[in-house]
Amino acid sequence: MSRGKTIRPSYYDEDESSQDELEYTLNKGRSNIGSESDSDVDEMSKISFGALNRAQTKLNKNNQKHKPSSWKENINNSSEEFFDSDSDSDGPPEETSSKDTKKKKNKHAPSESSSKRPVSRIRDIPGLPSRKQQTLHTDIRFDAAYGKADLIKARKDYAFLDEYRKQEIASMESLLKDKKNKLNDDEREEIKLQLQSLKSRMDTLKNRDLENNILSNYKKQQMESFKEGKVNKPYFLKRSDKRKILQKAKFDSMKPKQREKAMERKRKKRLGKEFRQLEFRPTNR
């Protein structure tokens, strides 16, 4: 007749019962190493993870003097991996991929790269736009690698765009003047800004065309006079002379109101320069 399993009622606290379970498992592990029955498996399955963890740490402390350091490291690593893993998950263990990138210990530390791959000459710096994004929508006709761009030739080739710009300016002005259009304040302000930028662009293009015409005409006159023998050698203008000639030509081509505005800006600029020269800092008493 087989003996029945005696179960004693637990009248201890939770800490004391876990300590008793710990001592019981330690004594039983020392006595019955290698022999494991079904009843032992059932009893072990009822023990909490906290008791198992304390048993593992106590075993490690007792066997530190008898085992080499490599064995200790393996035991500690296996126990940490076991108790750090999620105990509630019933699925298979996750596979760690070998292609995982190493994370930096510090964000200011230099980035690490494998020595097995060749390093590219052009590197992407974090925080700055990559070279591929910068050169994705660039026009190769204006690329510096193909030489310096000829602005005069480009202006002649794309002179037809001025007509489209004038039409766009006229349509914007009519849109702003028309009171039937129910435009918000934000939309009206945005149209005004676009109109102002288009007008300023047209003015800069006109000034550039005027400068190119004046300088080209001056060069032609010098070369013609040199060919006719009036001048021993052609005279090429200095920067200061160019500035004076261009300024005079701009003033002649301006309307009276534009001329007054330009003179007012120049006067304010000169006064500001004089005030900056006369400024002084008060002495500290």
Curated annotation (Swiss-Prot):
Q: Where is the composition biased (Basic and acidic residues)?
A: 249-263
> Which InterPro entries does the record match to this protein?
RRP36
Q: Which Pfam families match?
A: RRP36 (PF06102)
Provide the assembly information.
Associates with 90S and pre-40S pre-ribosomal particles.
The name this protein goes by in its record: rRNA biogenesis protein RRP36
Q: Which UniProt keywords apply?
A: Coiled coil, Nucleus, Ribonucleoprotein, Ribosome biogenesis, rRNA processing
Q: Which residues form the signal peptide?
A: none
Location relative to the cell: Nucleus, Nucleolus
Q: Which family does it belong to?
A: Belongs to the RRP36 family.
Record's GO cellular component terms: 90S preribosome; nucleolus
